[in-house]
Amino acid sequence: TNGSGKTLKTIQKSGPDGEITTSFEYDGIQRLVRVTDTEGNVTTSTYDMGDRRTEVNHPASGITSFTYDALGNVLTKQTANLAKEGKFITYDYDYQRLTGINYPDHPENNVKYYYGGRNASQNRIGRLMLREDGTGAIEYFYGKMGEVTKTRRTMIVPNQAIATYVTQWTYDSHNRLLEMIYPDEEKITYSYNLGGQLEKVHGYKSYGYDYVSKIGYDKFEQRTYLKYCNGAETFYTYDPQRRRLQNLTVNSGGNTIMDNAYTYDAVSNVLSVVNGASVPQSGKAGGQMAHTYTYDALYRLVSATGTYTGADNKTASYTLAMGYDNMHRITSKRQILTQNNVQFNGTLNAGYDLSYTYGTETGKKFQLANVKDVNYRT
């Protein structure tokens, strides 16, 4: 860092090709003006006398420029592509409230914003009341605390009739959602326990039904129990030291259909997921599964393996290997899959080996240039 506490350089010492460095430069009043990545790609910024960024030159997107009004609102934006034709995206304001976004091409995609005046109803005084864009319009209604209580969405479907959808919300004094009415008039109600946590979800349309019958929590406010309307129950347990999910069990119809156990590394990356549920009866879906994961020193997924055992002698396994460069771009992805009696009676061996290359020309850096794909199936 420099004397003002600004970061001058970051170094990651465990990249696949050595150190990964990023350098930062500032002007005399500590504004960021230059960033250089580990491959030497440079991003620069310029500012006006009001500390407003007027230009960004990025190795991938080129030069993007901005102009402002006296109050600091963005008036125009010009990307590298628009600059070739001398065009701009423009912005309109009313008392510093954005009222319009105007595109140089396809004006039907312009966006307009309307705000409630002093006589507006439904608590809309000074608030966004209507937004129009190329897809149609959406109207907003508010409660006394400024929460959105209703929207009316009007969609313009080409060669079709105009469609309108109304959605409504009701909240309690703690601003918790109590009720939601969908455009098809289905009403969903939410119930909470004494601690303010969601406990039940109930639906009504012609007749009543529960989506979620019960949710339970522990003293750490982590979910420990969930029961759906069909009777399926999910149980959650956590490790006592770091409160990470340790086991997830799903019971339905008197059977355990999922019994997942999780392990982690010191920084909470998932190392394994093992489903120890019983192998189902003949003809039934499901089964036992196990997955393992490894990571590099930068916590990027390097490899994964998995196995499956189901009814009727169904088995499967896979391996996955990933490669990255110092810019954190994927450079390779290789997967091998073996199945027995899963999709058909017999053995299937399949896989792919992908290699990724990226653009190097100005304006195309970081963009995916080519994918070499090798597939096989036996």
Name the predicted role of every residue range.
Residues 1-378:
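Beta-strand elements of repeat-based all-beta scaffolds
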